[in-house]
Amino acid sequence: TGIHLSGTPVGVGISLGKAIILHPGTPEEPPRESSNPPEEELQDFHSALEHTINDTIKLVEKISGDVGPEEAAIFHVHLMFLEDQHFQEKIQNYILEGNSVSWSIYETIEEYLSAFSEIDDPYLSEKGADLKDVGYRLLHFLGHELLAETQKEGILVIEELLPGDM
């Protein structure tokens, strides 16, 4: 007598065990105002950007080696977002207006997601999930914890598992 859960498996095969339910850490909107000068906020952004790009490159190498280059292709899309000049400039402009780096990233991601949601195209909907993952990972490098880590053994149950959570 138990609960039957169904979803999209990440692993192969059938699993029986205790469900470990993680609630995704969709971030709340960070504070808009910053107590730091824009120059410091820009420095924090560039540092988070560099860390996220390097981390993404490592993920591409790991996934390519472990699973295959086709499965790693999603992270190339992440790199495209991270290296996109317009994306970076939008965040930097918010920072230069006196906003916090966290809010600037959050707001930029929200604006992009809103634009993607208005387009009736399944491919672009998937890109929205990729962009959300990129934003969450940038925020993570700024110190925001977005997904609870667990050392428990069992079957991970989560509403949405983004590629960068792997």
What are the functions of these language-model segments?
Residues 1-166:
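Non-catalytic, soluble scaffold/interaction modules
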